[in-house]
UniProtKB/Swiss-Prot annotation:
Cellular compartment(s): Endoplasmic reticulum membrane
Single Gene Ontology BP annotation: ergosterol biosynthetic process
Outcome following mutation: residue 243 to N: In strain: azole-resistant isolates
Function in brief: The third module or late pathway involves the ergosterol synthesis itself through consecutive reactions that mainly occur in the endoplasmic reticulum (ER) membrane. Firstly, the squalene synthase ERG9 catalyzes the condensation of 2 farnesyl pyrophosphate moieties to form squalene, which is the precursor of all steroids.
Organism whose genome encodes this protein: Candida albicans (strain SC5314 / ATCC MYA-2876) (Yeast)
The Fatty acid hydroxylase domain, residue ranges: 214-337
Induction (UniProt): Expression is repressed during spider biofilm formation.
Lineage start: Eukaryota, Fungi, Dikarya, Ascomycota, Saccharomycotina
The protein's name: Delta(7)-sterol 5(6)-desaturase ERG3
Length: 386
């Protein structure tokens, strides 16, 4: 995110923050006492790990005894442990990296590296980008890919598309707010994101390998999180809003409860905290993930690939609830005994109206049996065909 943030700071935010939050301006004068009080707090220093006598003060690796633990040293030890993972050369805002300094870079009391400014900037950028990506990709999918015969499906809801859009547009800012801490960690050097491509970083070969590793890691993480979201107590509170859509349009892709969306995004944010990932590839993969999320909700069934968890597989998940939890592949569903092969009827092209009604009727019958087991007898959805 440092690339995106510096672009925005260079072309827009430096001047905006200088105008709205200038040094010695009214806002700065009002906040000065609070800033000074905060700066005078005596925070514990972060000691050098090498200075710890772990045998006597914390934990003896050879002869662990709870009596050897000195509680007073634990916070400092944890702080130092965390600090040891920080790459100070990757802290954002201390000096420009990609563009020259602007005339406004030092004229706001909120410097580029200020955590409050970073939080506000990230919220604005990611929310707007999230909305734009959602509407552009979903609209293009709706116009050029989406099978509009789904509007006649007996389990299509009244005003469904407007409900999907309302749910998504209100959820995206909250999901962004919940994920900002991960972006802040990245901006402050607590990740394995890198930019230089050389022998030390593995060159272009390493970047090519990062794509399947990212897909496999996140696919695994989402599978288990998705299964957890289907636990009855969790499903009822968090995941049921997304399963309101039995048959989907592309606009259902981001129509989540925001906490549900946050949990399902965790693997994407955890990956660069655990494994090396090129910064440009990181931005590409995050964009790709949003494309993919729209694509698997577009109701157009072109592939019945046994490996790829495509639109047909995800349609089965929305219709029959307890199957196909994976995001990109069918691997974990097969290992977890939750894979359900899409019905052949999904791939019938140019079916006659009567034949299509029979297919939908059979889908509805199977769906209602499973829905009753998952949600109970009462169905609060309002369908077009009641």
């Amino acid at each position: 995110m440092d690339i995106v943030l510096e672009i925005c700071d260079y072309y827009l935010f430096d001047k905006v923050y200088a105008d709205v939050f200038p040094k010695d301006g009214a806002v700065h004068e009002f906040l000065k006492p609070a800033i000074q009080s905060f700066s005078q707090i005596d925070f514990p220093s972060l000691p050098n790990l090498d200075s710890f006598d772990t045998n006597s003060t914390l934990i003896s690796s050879n002869n662990f005894n709870i009596s050897n633990v000195n509680p007073a040293t634990i916070p400092s030890y944890l702080f130092s442990k965390i600090a040891s993972y920080q790459d100070k050369s990757e802290i954002y805002g201390l000096a420009p990296k990609f563009f020259p300094a602007t005339d406004f870079i030092n004229t706001s009391f909120l410097a580029r590296s200020n955590i409050f400014r970073e939080t506000l900037s990230l919220f604005i950028i990611t929310t707007i980008f999230g909305w734009l990506l959602y509407f552009i990709v979903a609209y293009l999918s709706y116009v050029f890919v989406f099978d509009k015969k789904i509007f006649n499906h007996p389990r299509y809801l009244k005003n469904q598309m407007s409900l999907e859009i309302k749910r998504a547009t209100t959820a995206i800012p909250v999901m962004v707010l919940l994920t900002i801490p991960f972006f802040l960690l990245e901006l402050n050097g607590y990740s394995f994101l890198y930019l230089d491509i050389n022998e030390c970083t593995g060159g272009y070969k390493a970047i090519l390998w990062q794509i399947p590793k990212f897909i496999l890691f996140t696919d695994c993480g989402i599978y288990f999180l998705h299964r957890w979201l289907h636990w009855p107590s969790v499903y009822k509170v968090l995941h049921k809003p997304h399963h309101k859509w039995i048959v989907c349009t592309p606009f259902a892709s981001h129509a989540f409860h925001p906490v549900d969306g946050f949990f399902q995004s965790l693997p994407y944010h955890l990956y660069p905290l655990l494994f090396p990932l090129h910064k440009v590839l990181y931005l590409f993969l995050f964009t790709f993930v949003n494309f993919w999320t729209v694509m698997i909700h577009d109701g157009s069934y072109w592939s019945n690939d046994p490996v790829v968890n495509g639109t047909a597989c995800h349609t089965v998940h929305h219709l029959y609830f307890n199957y196909n939890y994976g995001q990109f592949t069918t691997l974990w569903d097969r290992l977890g005994n939750s894979y359900r092969r899409p019905d052949d009827s999904l791939f019938v092209k140019d079916a006659k109206a009567e034949e299509e009604k029979k297919i939908w009727k059979e889908q509805t019958r199977k769906m209602e049996e499973i829905r009753g087991e998952v949600e109970g007898k009462v169905d609060d959805r309002e369908y077009v065909e009641q």
